[in-house]
């Protein structure tokens, strides 16, 4: 790498003054160049200066065009002669980034494009009486910083992997010429401007480019901590330029582009380079666990493979670029993202687990409103689930029900939509037939599950005459059990009568009448909305004692109470083999037994 000649030893006093003078000029900002100024390069080419399009750490960048042309398709980077970075960058371009050499590398490796910029011209010019050095390069588009800011400091996963492949191509080109870049970051990666240019990213700013070491590892205090502190490598912290250091810098950037925050940034150590160095050493010494901390939901496989590989490289070992690229290429295939076309920087909306059955993007408020409309829980027959109901709730439901026409459940209902609750039941694994849900204390409204799209047959049972029964029992612990046998028959007005035929002999003249709707299928749970309807004739009637002794005692003790019943609902799918009393039972017929007892 070119070095500035040392002052002669004969004048030591002058040496000190000269050193101080040089230090005062080091990295001085350039003079402002007026728009329309013409620069003449070493090859006598003339370039018209356009508007300023950016200011770097030590120089300013202007749009430019050849004199006589109108398209500002080039840029001029201008710095005072005393500045070092542009001097290094210019000589790197002149020696290693000729357009012919770039094309030859692309042809050798079968590349359609390479993110390696090249120099168009260079020269010196006086601006406001001060000598400046300038270089002319092709003009590129926006840098990645713009997209990171737009997307909340992250990039789409597929785009990150494509950028990794493209930067590895540039690294391979530079390393093949004996140089390392040492300062890869989002601000130094630009997109192309020409037709199809958005498909290729270009690595720029070679102000820290230098020859990498191939011999012994010798730290250089003068070069310690060179680079951008967030991303500079462990070797660069010691002042040693290596090829593995370039890959390590790339890895830190990839982690950040995927939305994770580097530990030394989180810990706010950037103002103290030695602490950053120690944090990076600890991070790379146990890279597997370190990455798990940054990606608690799972480390992206290509990132894990790449960083583990980098951590095992020796300081003078040539990286296996093909192996590194293959990890990112495989990830792109799994994501079904092609490694061509324009780079996509639009973040896709992340889909939730959708546990509340709301579509992606549904607001929480809208989901809450929909949840209030869902009244029927998915029942767990293995657990004694209790569903509370109050008299006020029933009166409100009766009033709202009078305004609507009850929908009749017919066995031949077809093309019906599946209710949200049905979806929850279907999504559960076979071994877990039902999911327990806790009741809400708020008033519940009726849900309306639709009929199954497949026809189902129900046994025809002759209507049984109803006789006066005892006054309606309203006990606080009354429960309703649904278990294996049921006979259904339809009635006008959307009513269905459920007859208990669990015992060999039907209970004489005993029926329960409910307003409810069923949604039954071969592989789904039964969802039942039950509403108790008060009848005047039942309030004064006497009950028929056809229950077991335990249930009779429970009823006797609960007859004095006036609170609303608490229901316990147990459901299970029918195996399709009914008894002789129900010869017409279909496998799709729900099985329900209705009981009341004190819990």
Swiss-Prot record:
PROSITE patterns per record: PROTEIN_KINASE_ATP (PS00107), PROTEIN_KINASE_DOM (PS50011), PROTEIN_KINASE_ST (PS00108)
Which keywords are on file for this protein? ATP-binding, Cell cycle, Cell division, Chromatin regulator, Chromosome, Cytoplasm, Kinase, Magnesium, Meiosis, Metal-binding, Mitosis, Nucleotide-binding, Nucleus, Phosphoprotein, Serine/threonine-protein kinase, Transferase
Q: What class of enzyme is it?
A: transferase
- Sites of the modification Phosphoserine? 376, 381-382, 388, 390, 483, 564, 586
Region (Disordered) location: 340-507, 532-599
Cofactor requirements of the protein: Mg(2+)
Q: Which GO terms describe its molecular function?
A: ATP binding; histone H2AT120 kinase activity; metal ion binding; protein kinase activity; protein kinase binding; protein serine kinase activity; protein serine/threonine kinase activity
Compositionally biased spans, kind Polar residues: 349-361
Q: What happens when the gene is disrupted?
A: RNAi-mediated knockdown in muscles causes 91 percent lethality at the early pupal stage and the few surviving animals cannot fly. Severe defects in the indirect flight muscle structure characterized by narrower and wavy myofibrils and abnormal positioning of sarcomere Z line, M line and H line. Although the spacing between Z line and M lines stays regular, in less affected myobrils Z lines and M lines appear fragmented, Z lines are diffused at the edges and sarcomere length is shorter.
- Composition bias type Low complexity, residue spans: 546-558
What's a BP term from Gene Ontology annotated to this protein? cell division
Compartments where found: Cytoplasm; Nucleus; Chromosome; Cytoplasm, Myofibril, Sarcomere, Z line
* Tissues in which the protein is found: Expressed in ovaries (at protein level). Expressed in indirect flight muscle (IFM) (at protein level).
| E.C. designation(s) | 2.7.11.1
The annotated regions of Basic and acidic residues compositional bias extend over 435-448
| Pfam families hit by this protein | Pkinase (PF00069)
Q: Per its UniProt record, what Gene3D superfamilies does this chain match?
A: Transferase(Phosphotransferase) domain 1 (1.10.510.10)
The record's function comment reads: Serine/threonine-protein kinase involved in somatic mitosis and female meiosis. Required for spindle organization in mitosis, and for the establishment or maintenance of meiosis-specific chromosomal configurations, including the prophase I karyosome and the metaphase I spindle. Specifically phosphorylates nucleosomal H2A on 'Thr-119'. Required for the development and organization of indirect flight muscle sarcomeres by regulating the formation of M line and H zone and the correct assembly of thick and thin filaments in the sarcomere.
Report the sequence similarity comment from the record.
Belongs to the protein kinase superfamily. CK1 Ser/Thr protein kinase family. VRK subfamily.
* Protein's name according to its UniProt entry: Nucleosomal histone kinase 1
Annotated source species:
Drosophila melanogaster (Fruit fly)
